[in-house]
């Protein structure tokens, strides 16, 4: 497992260089004031994208579900291999698709994939349906992972993007922690079906929130154009 890490470091040291940047004056160290200067649109996008962490549980729950449907412990990691294989294959065309149908539309599609994955995993009683759910989860990851940071970069002012990224990492980390604790409690108290069913509901709630935000932005754009 350490070999890829060493190869990545070697590639960064020997094969990657920063592009030339114009000289800048002394810059102030980052502070909370930078986050407070973010506008409402940036805060809204950070909140919407961070809340997805409530619906997207840790991959450990996939492993436990695999054991629940009869996957032998020695083959349980195959689910993670499938997840990341689909993730990698799906992520490749996302850039081209985002230029055609828009980034927020792709994010909505990714949440549909996540809801479908949760439904499949909630209903799975055999390995075929389980692996279908894992593949759908991989599609969600492929369609959403790079988009989240891109959407925040688009929403934030250029001079405050670092603050926006840091705030997103903080909020999404806290939300993911809370979501995984809640998922664990649901699993212990009500079983895997309830856990993934709640995940499906949260995914759809996130999708509705983003769809509502898109409609509001479109209405504002039409209003500005008519003035």
Predicted regions, residues:
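Structural signature of the two symmetry-related core transmembrane helices
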Residues: 2, 105-120, 197-200
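C-terminal membrane-cytosol helix-exit motif in multi-pass small-molecule transporters
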Residues: 2-24, 207-214
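Juxtamembrane intracellular "pre-TM" segments in multi-pass secondary transporters
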Residues: 17-48
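Short amphipathic helix-loop junctions that connect adjacent transmembrane helices
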Residues: 60-76, 80
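Loop-to-transmembrane helix entry/capping segments in MFS-fold secondary transporters
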Residues: 73-74, 158-168
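Residue-level signature of mid-helix packing/kink "hotspots" within the transmembrane helices
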Residues: 84-92, 173-177
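Helix-to-loop junctions at the C-terminal end of transmembrane segments
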Residues: 90-103, 187-188
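Intracellular juxtamembrane helix-capping segments at the cytosolic ends
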Residues: 143-156
């Amino acid at each position: 497992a350490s070999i890829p890490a060493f190869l990545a470091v070697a590639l960064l040291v020997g094969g990657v260089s920063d592009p030339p940047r114009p000289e800048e004056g002394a810059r102030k160290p980052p502070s909370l004031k930078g986050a407070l200067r973010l506008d409402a649109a940036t805060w809204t996008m950070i909140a919407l994208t961070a809340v997805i962490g409530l619906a997207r549980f840790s991959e450990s729950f996939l492993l436990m579900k695999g054991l629940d449907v009869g996957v032998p412990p020695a083959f349980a990691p195959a689910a993670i291999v499938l997840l990341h294989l689909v993730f990698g294959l799906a992520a490749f065309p996302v850039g081209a698709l985002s230029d055609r149908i828009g980034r927020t539309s792709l994010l909505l599609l990714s949440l549909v994939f996540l809801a479908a994955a949760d439904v499949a995993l909630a209903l799975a009683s055999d390995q075929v349906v389980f692996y279908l759910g894992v593949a759908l989860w991989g599609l969600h990851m492929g369609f959403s992972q790079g988009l989240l940071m891109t959407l925040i970069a688009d929403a934030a002012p250029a001079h405050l993007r670092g603050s926006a990224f840091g705030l997103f990492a903080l909020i999404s980390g806290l939300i993911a922690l809370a979501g995984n604790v809640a998922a664990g409690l649901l699993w212990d108290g009500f079983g895997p079906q309830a856990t993934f069913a709640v995940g499906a509901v949260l995914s759809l709630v996130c999708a509705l929130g983003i769809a509502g935000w898109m409609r509001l932005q479109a209405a504002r754009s039409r209003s500005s154009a008519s003035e």
